[in-house]
Design a protein with these regions (language model features):
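Start-transfer (signal-anchor) and selected internal transmembrane alpha helices
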Residues: 1-32, 151-195, 420-427, 534-543, ...
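Transmembrane signal-anchor helices characteristic of membrane glycosylation enzymes that use polyprenol
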Residues: 15-35, 179-210, 217-255, 426-444, ...
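Transmembrane-helix motifs of polytopic, lipid-linked glycan transferases
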Residues: 169-172, 303-326
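Interfacial juxtamembrane loops and adjacent helix segments
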Residues: 221-304
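Membrane-lumen/periplasm interface segments of multi-pass, membrane-embedded glycan/lipid transferases
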Residues: 262-264, 439-528
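Transmembrane-helix signature of polytopic, membrane-embedded enzymes
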Residues: 296-299, 318-339
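Perimembrane helix-loop-helix junctions
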Residues: 363-372, 398-430
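Membrane-interface alpha helices of multi-pass inner-membrane proteins
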Residues: 378-395, 400-406
Length: 625
């Protein structure tokens, strides 16, 4: 083996070892300093009716309160509570402690106790002097344990390794961004996504994730009889967001769901029918089917279904970056949008839509920018088919296929091929659009009132809403423009659209100081060597198509999810704008705003900033304590 190659391998091995060692060092010294370095360990167990632990000066009991007075301020890392209660119980406790300046403070903390888990854990991390626990009526305190010990948090440890690895790559692997932007971006998404899936485990924090999981699970049986069990029923009802908020409770819930997966097993008949939107669940259903085939535990089966979505997103964005003819940084940046990476780790049909809309636009761009070539017509044909298949999940996006009407004429062999191609575009456009429009027209013709609203409830009715729009068209147009304009900025460039993690949380507005310059900089600023500017006719056509898609999005949600005659359009979410980001950026492309920086710096900024925002969201939302 060549000595230079051997040196490179040795260098990477040393870097990996140092990364792992540094992560362990930060975990032990940074997050376990009081217990690991200073040796401040404690384990105080109090059980009503039992002996008072020697660390306590006194225990005061009054009605539904228990007050524990410690002999001296004691560092307590966590509290474990066991209650005797038949149902979920919200409890609170007051902690009197010394802060870092040895000043006495009083803090109220509330938490939820789930009897299914058998224990409740709360992070304290304080020098406790007095702890007062309030137990609601109907619940009985079995025991309370205050303890502090050196414990490695596997989620935080992996998180630290991931962050250190990213820093190493960004500052030492400039050539990766120049020569292999597609591989680098795909690798970053895969690492971040896998960590998200692993750290979240069995929880439904995505948008309507319980509905999407149910459909994917049913599809995994191929229709007809579906095997049911207690865990499946719990997931379909949606697990509460506060099922757990510590790593210990997460492990208890995972074990509980794994056990219940084999409890009350039975079969149920479900008639899924024919629904084009189900194409968005095929890979997730395949993952669940594979999990059952290999008899995986439920938590692994659940995560495998999510992993299928993530792999589709990674592979799709990899090829979108590779095929992008100019300014590949644009696709890499959009692929790394924190909200979309998070969505790719949940049960949803948004991922196929987003991936195929992106690929369709890139193939169309390749044709109009590169002109006539041997593969131009293949790219264009691929764009049509990809647009068509991708929009089956949400037909309101199918007008994006209309960009294929606007292509250079020289790419066609003759007029016959051109006519056939435009006929194909029209056929796909009409066929997919009818999956959305035709049912509405049929419901209206059959006067199906009271059966076409939101199944979750509310004064909604598609037929009555459609008739309301037709009766008051000017009022609806005014409402439409008011709603679109009021939400335009936050949906396209705010944390709601770019840095939101479902039920977990949305990054605070202070991150907008980084997010907004990043998205606008990526849009308007280019390097002279890689500037992407389309002809005005293409920009105009894209603008018209974007307006049509916006109209369909807002109108579809007004029909389905807004009360009849409402002066507000309900149901529209910022994530629905993601497939429109690339077309909007292309419209705003220009030759005047030129950056004089190297390609490696530009690409590291484009990919590094959204990665940093995603990591910030992870640290605040996931199990770092």
């Amino acid at each position: 083996m060549d000595m230079n190659v051997l040196k490179k391998i040795l260098k990477e091995v040393v870097a990996a070892v140092l990364t792992i060692a540094l992560a362990f060092g930060i975990e032990l010294i940074g997050f376990n300093y009081r217990t690991f370095v200073k040796g401040e360990t404690a384990d105080i167990l109090y059980q009503p009716g039992g002996e008072v632990p020697e660390e306590l000066e006194a225990v005061e009991k009054k009605y539904y309160r228990v007050r524990l007075l410690l002999k001296e301020p004691t560092y307590i890392k966590k509290m474990q509570v066991i209650l005797n209660t038949p149902e979920k119980t919200d409890y609170s406790f007051y902690v009197r402690y010394d802060n870092a300046f040895k000043a006495e403070k009083l803090e109220k903390i509330t938490d939820a106790y789930w009897p299914e888990l058998g224990s409740g854990f709360t992070n304290l991390d304080k020098d406790v002097k007095v702890l007062t626990l309030s137990i609601p009526k109907g619940a009985e305190l079995v025991s309370v344990r205050l303890y502090s010990s050196t414990a490695l948090n596997k989620y935080r440890l992996l998180f630290l390794m991931m962050v250190l690895f990213f820093l190493y790559v960004i500052f030492t692997k400039k050539q990766w961004f120049v020569e292999h932007l597609d591989w680098t971006t795909a690798g970053a998404i895969l690492i971040l996504g896998c960590f998200t899936i692993f750290s979240q485990g069995v929880i439904e924090n995505g948008w309507d994730e319980q509905i999407h999981f149910d459909r994917a699970y049913q599809l995994s049986f191929g229709g007809g009889a579906v095997k049911t069990n207690d865990t499946y029923e719990l997931l379909c009802e949606r697990l509460a967001k506060d099922c757990y908020n510590t790593a210990e409770e997460k492990e208890l819930l995972t074990q509980y769901l794994n056990d219940k997966y084999h409890s009350n097993e039975g079969t149920a008949e479900y008639n899924l029918g024919v629904n084009c939107a189900y194409t968005g669940y095929l890979l997730q259903a395949f993952g669940i089917w594979v999990g059952r085939l290999f008899h995986l535990s439920f938590n692994r089966l659940f995560m495998l279904g999510k992993l299928m979505n993530l792999l589709l997103y990674v592979v799709g964005m990899f090829f979108a970056i590779r095929l992008m003819p100019k300014k590949k940084e644009l696709i890499a940046a959009l692929a790394m949008v924190p909200t979309q990476v998070y969505i790719a780790t949940t049960y949803t049909y948004d991922v196929p839509l987003n991936v195929f809309m992106m690929l369709g636009m890139v193939l169309w761009l390749k044709v109009i920018l590169e002109g006539k070539s041997e593969k131009a017509f293949r790219y264009l044909l691929g764009s049509v088919l990809i647009f068509g298949f991708g929009s089956l999940a949400k037909a309101v996006y199918i007008p994006m296929i209309a960009v294929c009407y606007f292509v250079p004429g020289e790419i066609f062999k003759d007029k016959k091929q051109k006519r056939l191609f435009f006929g194909l575009v029209s056929a796909v456009l009409i066929a997919v659009l009818m999956t959305f429009v035709l049912p509405t027209l049929i419901w209206n013709a059959n006067n199906e009132i009271g059966t076409t609203g939101d199944p979750r409830g509310g004064d909604t009715d598609v037929v009555l809403q459609l008739r309301s729009i037709l009766a008051y068209p000017l009022q609806y147009i005014k409402l439409f423009f008011k709603e679109v304009i009021s939400e335009f900025g936050s949906y396209f460039a705010g944390t709601a659209g770019l840095a939101c993690f479902g039920r977990m949380r949305e990054l605070s507005s202070r991150w907008s100081y980084i997010l907004i310059p990043w998205i606008f900089g990526t849009t308007f600023l280019s390097r002279k060597e890689d500037c992407l500017v389309m002809e005005k006719k293409y920009k105009l056509s894209l603008g018209v198509i974007l307006f049509v898609v916006l109209g369909l999005i807002w109108s579809a949600l007004y029909l389905s999810y807004s009360p009849v005659g409402s002066t507000h359009i309900s149901g529209v979410q910022a994530r629905y704008y993601y497939p429109l980001l690339l077309p909007l950026m292309l419209i705003m492309g220009n030759k005047r705003c030129i950056l004089d920086i190297s390609q490696s710096v530009y690409r590291r900024i484009a990919v590094g900033i959204p990665a940093m925002l995603l990591i910030a969201g992870m640290y605040g939302s996931f199990f770092m304590r």
